[in-house]
Amino acid sequence: MKSFNIDHFIASVLQWILNIALIILSIVLSIFLINETITFIQYIFSAKKYTSYKLVESIIVYFLYFEFIALIIKYFKSNYHFPLRYFIYIGITALIRLIIVSHEEPMETLLYAGAILVLVIALYISNMRDLRKE
């Protein structure tokens, strides 16, 4: 007869809650992605001229949604594990968006660029670790 393991039960329940929350989040993000696609198409075919910053910001927000959805897909495909490099990709993309949208203060822009450099170095180190495993 199997004994009841409370630790395993709690972990299983929490894993189910996390999975359901991530599925709901992926549905919401997919809706936002579709909305961003429609907005992007409207920018392209609109007679009104939008600034290139607005268009580039729209594209980067689109990729942020896309990266978060890809991260959730990877979570389920890799046995409930979030790979570090996907978070780094999202961080780099978000910082690039910040530089494009908010570039009035040179010192802030320099700090964002430095943060991107740190993330790229972290990505390189992470990838080197993965290459050594192979």
Swiss-Prot record:
Transmembrane segments annotated in the record for this chain: 14-34, 56-76, 82-102, 106-126
First-listed, main subcellular location of the protein, grouped into a coarse class: membrane
Keywords: Cell membrane, Membrane, Transmembrane, Transmembrane helix
GO cellular component: plasma membrane
Membrane topology: Multi-pass membrane protein
One of the GO biological process terms: cellular response to phosphate starvation
HAMAP family xref list: PsiE
Recorded family membership: Belongs to the PsiE family.
NCBIfam families: PRK02833.1-3
Protein name: Protein PsiE homolog
Originating species: Bacillus anthracis
Encoding gene, per UniProt annotation: psiE
